[in-house]
């Protein structure tokens, strides 16, 4: 685990998805950011449920990946980190990209917290583009 909490979350989910694991354990160094991103994924239907787990004074978020009904394995979600510590990417609300014509989501960090592209457009605020999920 490095210093980039968001990249660690995305990498943990992507690795669990590639290994066809049902659950993923996300280390929460910054519990607020981790919880907000996982709650967005839960609300948008990319994961099924999430629970907090504490072990030796360390907090973990245990997330269950969403599975297909008639086939084994999880849905293939593509998660891509956009803004990173070495290169920050910002956008106003009018220029927030639409992923797959609105089928995917963009997670942004705004002055009002972490939210999706749809919420940011409705509120008329822009921010730092954290990642794309489709």
UniProtKB/Swiss-Prot annotation:
Subcellular location: Plastid, Chloroplast
Function as written in the Swiss-Prot or TrEMBL entry: One of the primary rRNA binding proteins, it binds directly to 16S rRNA central domain where it helps coordinate assembly of the platform of the 30S subunit.
GO cellular component, as recorded: chloroplast; ribonucleoprotein complex; ribosome
Family note: Belongs to the universal ribosomal protein uS8 family.
Molecular function in Gene Ontology: rRNA binding; structural constituent of ribosome
Protein name: Small ribosomal subunit protein uS8c
Taxonomic source organism: Chloranthus spicatus (Chulantree)
Gene3D superfamilies, A to Z: 3.30.1370.30, 3.30.1490.10
PROSITE patterns: RIBOSOMAL_S8
Keyword Membrane among UniProt keywords: no
Keyword presence, Lyase: no
Gene name, Swiss-Prot/TrEMBL: rps8
Record's keyword terms, sorted: Chloroplast, Plastid, Ribonucleoprotein, Ribosomal protein, RNA-binding, rRNA-binding
């Amino acid at each position: 685990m490095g210093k980039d909490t968001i990249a660690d979350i995305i990498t943990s989910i992507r690795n669990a998805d590639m290994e066809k694991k049902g659950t993923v354990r996300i280390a929460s160094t910054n519990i607020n950011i981790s919880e907000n991103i996982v709650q967005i994924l839960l609300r948008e239907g990319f994961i099924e449920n999430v629970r907090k787990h504490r072990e030796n004074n360390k907090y973990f978020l245990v997330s269950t990946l969403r599975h297909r009904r008639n086939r084994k394995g999880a849905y293939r979600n593509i998660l891509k980190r956009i803004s990173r510590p070495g290169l920050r990417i910002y956008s106003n609300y009018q220029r927030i990209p639409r992923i797959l014509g609105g089928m995917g989501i963009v997670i942004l960090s705004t002055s009002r917290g972490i939210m999706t592209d749809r919420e940011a457009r409705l509120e008329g605020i822009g921010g730092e583009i954290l990642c794309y999920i489709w």
